[in-house]
């Protein structure tokens, strides 16, 4: 397959916001270059997962190799490295951009520039990529190509005199795009003589061959049967199978600098072949790895419990299998007095959490309850020890801790001007710190806030969408930890603390959250034979309380008239029974109560 010189190889990716037509554009390119036969074509060809096709988002990266005969009569090899467009997967995006020399910036001609487009463009510029702007969906009745072109020049700072106007759905402008990739994207550096260095930009688990690693050769050459070393995990493997993605796997004997392919080497788990790691030869290793590798760190944690306790082992197997494919997922066993056995799982962000939960329910037929998502807090104890805590129940007592720090993020919201007020109001209620506001055009604004991550993980995104009728888009990045006035809010039902309902909140909000929780639980916990107190407490101080009245039998029904002392005796006897029942009775907190707490409007 190495019949084409390096000068005729082009590696590029497509940058676009969700729904701007990236997958459709990739489909048309595969069709026009006859990479995929007409009869095999289906929509969103590169999105393999059922969930991706349904939500119309790209979760796992895909790659495809296309052969294209340009107008100059030469045959070129175009390697498309697809990227996920969502903020949770920005590390994966940065790695796949590092494997390219150019990028197509696809913008919807009716929507304009969105927040995630912007974030990914900056990543591409950091990697020194050549950016080719493309206006997509120009066939739509609401398309405003001139306004959007001006916006791209204004916001992104690209020269758009030769912007390509295309409609992936109608197949317009596809040849212009292919031609401009050949003309504008620089070829890879010709470094075949140097020691092997290749960048892993994706990997997935195949039950028969082990982990399949997608990589781009940066320097040198790799052959089937070579012994290779992964520089971050320090493990060595022998390559059993080497090939290119066209887009189905086609085996080859060797790949040289500039090419994109895959290999299998009986690797047991995706954790051993992390995205961003460098592959080098075990015999003549390269002196230094490629820059930019970091471990994917989970940012959001929550408990996953099976509704049926018998499914615990199934849940463990399912998580083990998902983990083979998803190195960013972490989990450890957890027990809760209210929910039984389950797992504490860590995710990159909220979308990642939702996708994992949905895949567990859909692919493994599990019925799950999730506890409220929490973030990683940093606690300094009075002894000077620093602890990282992702579960409110691990928080030390107030007298033992010196300070609690929480992660802060910078949120960029791009919105039509009419919604600026409501978005600023939302950010202020979430303890946001206003940083900056820029006007792109008369009608579009970029608002920048700094917010605690904990305020964003619950329902910030849903609120943003509903307040702006879906027009606003957001993008966030972590900016570090800051000290906060944080307390642990415990919920006591019948004087017993329910660990799954505990949460870490800001002191100023504790009363309102506690009050709302108590009222919500009063509605949801069924009445028992005895009176149940529901209390919200910080340490030993009760800050809010509600009571669920007892169900009681009318013991006076059989007394007609007669002496008052007779009635008193019966009532006192009943009260005594209720008192005894209360001391030994247990209260069942239904699952709806846990779910409702997640949806408490902060």
Curated annotation (Swiss-Prot):
NCBIfam families found in the cross-reference section: lepA, small_GTP
Naturally occurring in which organism (per UniProt): Picosynechococcus sp. (strain ATCC 27264 / PCC 7002 / PR-6) (Agmenellum quadruplicatum)
Main EC class the enzyme belongs to: hydrolase
Enzyme Commission number(s) of this protein: 3.6.5.n1
The protein's role, per its UniProt record: Required for accurate and efficient protein synthesis under certain stress conditions. May act as a fidelity factor of the translation reaction, by catalyzing a one-codon backward translocation of tRNAs on improperly translocated ribosomes. Back-translocation proceeds from a post-translocation (POST) complex to a pre-translocation (PRE) complex, thus giving elongation factor G a second chance to translocate the tRNAs correctly. Binds to ribosomes in a GTP-dependent manner.
Gene Ontology molecular function: any one: GTP binding
Compartment annotation: Cell inner membrane
Pfam family, one: EFG_C
Protein name per the record: Elongation factor 4
Keyword RNA-binding set for record: no
């Amino acid at each position: 397959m190495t019949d084409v010189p390096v000068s005729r190889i082009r590696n590029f990716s497509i940058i676009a916001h969700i729904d701007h037509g990236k997958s459709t554009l990739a489909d048309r390119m595969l069709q026009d270059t006859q990479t995929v036969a007409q009869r095999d074509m289906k929509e969103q060809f590169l999105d393999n997962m059922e969930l991706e096709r349904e939500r119309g988002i790209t979760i796992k990266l895909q790659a495809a190799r296309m052969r294209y005969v340009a107008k100059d009569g030469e045959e070129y090899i175009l390697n498309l490295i697809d990227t996920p467009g969502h903020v949770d997967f920005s590390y994966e995006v940065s790695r796949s951009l590092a494997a390219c020399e150019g990028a197509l910036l696809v913008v919807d001609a009716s929507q304009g520039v969105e927040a995630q487009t912007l974030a990914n463009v900056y990543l591409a510029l950091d990697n020194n990529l050549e950016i080719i702007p493309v206006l997509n969906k120009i066939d739509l009745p609401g398309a405003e190509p001139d306004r959007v072109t001006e916006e791209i020049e204004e916001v992104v700072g690209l020269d758009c005199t030769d912007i390509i106007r295309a409609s992936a759905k109608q197949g317009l402008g596809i040849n212009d795009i292919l031609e401009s990739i050949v003309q504008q994207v620089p070829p890879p550096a010709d470094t075949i003589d140097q020691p092997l260095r290749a960048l892993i930009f994706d990997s997935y688990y195949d039950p028969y061959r082990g982990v399949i690693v997608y990589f781009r050769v940066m320097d040198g050459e790799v052959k089937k049967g070579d012994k290779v070393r992964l520089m971050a995990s320090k493990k060595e493997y022998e390559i059993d199978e080497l090939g290119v993605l066209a887009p189905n796997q086609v085996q080859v004997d060797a790949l040289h600098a500039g090419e994109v392919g895959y290999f299998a080497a009986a690797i047991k788990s995706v954790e051993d072949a992390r995205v961003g790691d460098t592959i080098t030869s075990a015999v003549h290793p390269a002196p230094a790895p490629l820059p930019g590798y970091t471990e994917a760190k989970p940012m959001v944690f929550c408990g996953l419990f099976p509704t049926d306790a018998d499914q615990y082992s199934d849940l463990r197997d399912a998580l083990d299998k998902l983990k083979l494919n998803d190195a960013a997922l972490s989990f450890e066993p957890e027990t809760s007095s209210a929910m039984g056995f389950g797992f504490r799982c860590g995710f990159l962000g909220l979308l990642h959490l939702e996708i994992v939960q949905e895949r567990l329910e859909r692919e493994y037929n599990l019925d799950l309850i999730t506890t409220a998502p929490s973030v990683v807090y940093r606690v300094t104890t009075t002894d000077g020890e620093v602890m990282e805590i992702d579960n409110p129940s691990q928080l030390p007592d107030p007298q033992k801790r010196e300070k609690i720090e929480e992660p802060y993020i910078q949120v960029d919201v791009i919105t039509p001007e009419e919604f600026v007020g409501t978005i600023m109001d939302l950010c202020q209620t979430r303890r946001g710190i206003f940083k900056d506001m820029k006007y792109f055009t008369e009608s579009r604004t970029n608002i920048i806030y700094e917010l605690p991550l904990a305020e964003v993980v619950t329902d910030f995104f849903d609120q943003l969408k509903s307040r702006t009728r879906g027009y606003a888009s957001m993008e966030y990045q972590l900016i570090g930890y800051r000290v906060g006035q944080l307390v642990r809010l415990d919920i006591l039902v019948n004087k017993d603390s329910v660990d799954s309902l505990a949460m870490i909140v800001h002191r100023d909000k504790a009363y309102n959250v506690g009050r709302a929780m108590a009222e919500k639980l009063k509605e949801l916990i069924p009445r028992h034979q005895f009176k149940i107190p529901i209390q919200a407490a910080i340490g030993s101080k009760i800050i809010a309380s509600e009571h669920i009245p007892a169900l009681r039998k009318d013991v006076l029904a059989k007394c007609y008239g007669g002496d008052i002392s007779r009635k008193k005796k019966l009532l006192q006897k009943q009260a005594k029974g209720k008192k005894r029942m209360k001391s030994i009775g247990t209260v069942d907190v239904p699952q709806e109560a846990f779910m409702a707490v997640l949806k408490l409007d902060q």
